[in-house]
């Protein structure tokens, strides 16, 4: 394994695979904060060159956190299909990138090849891709999952309806649900981030969500994004269960900082299969985001792109209905400006799809970042072009509870009509029955929540 290269007469020597992975990243403030970023553009190019010549086996055999030290590493490594891996283990990362981007490589080819990839290998491919590569490659890798709606079908574009309220006021939540539905939003999930994380409050909010779903016979699923154990307890006590949610991290230490163990995720999957009101096989929902491991002091000297890829390796094990990166939510300490946020969003979507998960993105930023609403619109259009499964939707994109800026209900409508995309088929049929959509286009009734009253 070669760890050095010569560039413009200068020799660049790297100590190990972890350092090569980190320094091959595009510039981002989180890697600088962690002390792992390349010192110059020249060193970054040198690291990319070294990384491109490494083999799949080189990367697999050198995980950024040792197998014996970390349950996430063990899960990722143990899930590898050895037959698929043996076919590609001697490929260089450059050859793997070319394979993913090749027009001769089919969806089925990638579906088999991805079974032989560890998360570090997935991250390595992303690091030597341009933004256009990330878009083009992801578009070639659709991932379709089924709950009560079917998400990820090529030609469709879904959205989470996110009716958050600063007091968990159920009238406010219901009003936002009606407005979102009137724009054709909600086919991914109707999901509330609660202020208060307890069984009673969670049950009350779930009852509100399913009160609307049941009244209008809406083919979708609800979720309250409390801690996974709170959701499990509420569902066991009789609350209506849709998707079961949890934020995840790419290391065992990071999971512990979130109060999560793999056994909890195992239990969530079992409870969902037993109790939840889901027609399909997929009942879990995960959120991630670059920088989460570093913010928890749980990155072990690894860069944030690689740690994010490990989130997807963990998620893949549980076959979730949806996963999304909350890409700019963590703030400028980790992704400083719109350029870094856009790059991260494209990387995350590409890595999620190459990992084989139903990947969406919360196109967002915090109010102290060097970004504005144009960032969200730029990123959502780029991601929709890349085949992203879903984005978020809330009134005017302003989340007054979480205090950040995301995409609005009308943004989903704009993307669908701009790029000739449709909601999930089950949800579109319901929209047509309500007079909100006809022939894939919103009608004059759209955007008027009073049609539900």
Swiss-Prot record:
EC number: 4.3.1.7
Homology family: Belongs to the EutB family.
Induction (free text): When grown in ethanolamine and adenosylcobalamin (AdoCbl) (at protein level). Note this experiment was done in strain JM109, which expresses the eut operon.
Subunit record text: The basic unit is a heterodimer which dimerizes to form tetramers. The heterotetramers trimerize; 6 large subunits form a core ring with 6 small subunits projecting outwards.
GO cellular component, as recorded: cytosol; ethanolamine ammonia-lyase complex; ethanolamine degradation polyhedral organelle
Gene3D superfamilies in the record: Aldolase class I (3.20.20.70), ethanolamine ammonia-lyase heavy chain domain like (2.30.170.30), lyase (1.10.220.70)
UniProt record, GO biological process: amino acid metabolic process; ethanolamine catabolic process
Protein's pathway: Amine and polyamine degradation; ethanolamine degradation
One Gene Ontology MF term: ethanolamine ammonia-lyase activity
Main function: Catalyzes the deamination of various vicinal amino-alcohols to oxo compounds. Allows this organism to utilize ethanolamine as the sole source of nitrogen and carbon in the presence of external vitamin B12. It is spontaneously inactivated by its substrate and reactivated by EutA.
Co-factor remark: Binds 1 AdoCbl between the large and small subunits, with 6 cofactors per holoenzyme.
Protein name per Swiss-Prot or TrEMBL: Ethanolamine ammonia-lyase large subunit
Catalytic activity: ethanolamine = acetaldehyde + NH4(+)
NCBIfam families: PRK15067.1
Binding site for adenosylcob(III)alamin: 194, 246, 295, 401
Annotated control of activity: Inhibited by 5-adeninylpentylcobalamin (AdePeCbl), a cofactor analog. Irreversibly inhibited during catalysis by cleavage of the Co-C bond of the cobalamin coenzyme. Reactivated by EutA, which probably involves an ATP-dependent cobalamin exchange.
PANTHER family: ETHANOLAMINE AMMONIA-LYASE HEAVY CHAIN (PTHR39329), ETHANOLAMINE AMMONIA-LYASE LARGE SUBUNIT (PTHR39329:SF1)
Subcellular location: Bacterial microcompartment
Positions bound to substrate: 160-162, 193, 287, 362
HAMAP family named among the record's database cross-references: EutB
Cofactor: adenosylcob(III)alamin
InterPro entries registered for this protein in UniProt: Aldolase_TIM, EutB, EutB_dom_2_sf, EutB_N_sf
């Amino acid at each position: 394994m070669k760890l050095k290269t010569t560039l413009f007469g200068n020799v660049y020597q790297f100590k190990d695979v972890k350092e090569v992975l980190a320094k091959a990243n595009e510039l981002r403030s989180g890697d600088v904060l962690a002390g792992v970023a390349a010192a110059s553009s020249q060193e970054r190019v040198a690291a990319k060159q070294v990384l491109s010549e490494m083999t799949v086996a080189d990367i697999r055999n050198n995980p950024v956190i040792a197998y014996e030290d970390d349950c996430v590493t063990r899960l990722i490594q143990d899930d590898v299909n050895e037959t698929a891996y043996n076919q590609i283990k001697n490929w260089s990362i450059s050859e793997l990138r070319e394979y993913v981007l090749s027009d001769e490589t089919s969806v089925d080819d990638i579906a088999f090849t991805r079974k032989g990839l560890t998360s570090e290998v997935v991250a390595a491919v992303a690091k030597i891709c341009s933004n256009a590569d990330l878009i083009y490659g992801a578009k070639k890798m659709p991932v379709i999952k089924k709950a009560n709606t079917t998400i990820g079908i090529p030609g469709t574009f879904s959205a989470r309806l996110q009716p958050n309220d600063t007091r968990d006021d159920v009238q406010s939540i219901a009003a936002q649900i009606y407005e979102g539905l009137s724009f054709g939003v909600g086919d991914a999930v109707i999901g509330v981030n609660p202020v208060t994380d307890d069984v009673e409050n969670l049950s009350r909010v779930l009852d509100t969500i399913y009160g609307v779903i049941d009244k209008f016979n809406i083919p979708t699923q609800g979720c309250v994004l409390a801690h996974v154990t709170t959701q499990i307890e509420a569902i066991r006590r009789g609350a209506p269960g849709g998707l079961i949610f949890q934020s995840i991290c790419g290391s065992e230490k990071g999971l512990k900082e979130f109060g999560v163990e793999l056994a909890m995720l195992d239990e969530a999957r079992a409870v969902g299969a037993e109790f939840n009101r889901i027609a399909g096989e997929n009942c879990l929902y995960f959120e991630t985001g670059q920088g989460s491991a570093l913010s928890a002091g749980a990155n072990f000297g690894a860069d944030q792109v690689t740690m994010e890829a490990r989130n997807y390796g963990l998620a893949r094990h549980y076959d979730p209905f949806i996963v999304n990166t909350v890409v700019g939510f963590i703030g400028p300490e980790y992704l400083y400006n719109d350029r870094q946020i856009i790059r991260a969003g494209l990387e995350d979507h590409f890595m999620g799809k190459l990992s084989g998960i139903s990947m969406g993105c919360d196109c967002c930023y915090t109010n102290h970042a060097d970004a504005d609403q144009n960032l969200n619109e730029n990123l959502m259009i780029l991601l929709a072009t890349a085949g992203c499964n879903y984005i978020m939707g809330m009134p005017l994109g302003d989340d007054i509870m979480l205090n950040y800026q995301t995409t609005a209900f009308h943004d989903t409508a704009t993307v669908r009509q701009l790029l000739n995309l449709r909601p999930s088929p089950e949800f579109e049929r319901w929209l047509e029955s309500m007079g909100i959509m006809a022939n894939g286009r919103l009608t004059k009734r759209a955007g008027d929540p009073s049609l539900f009253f």
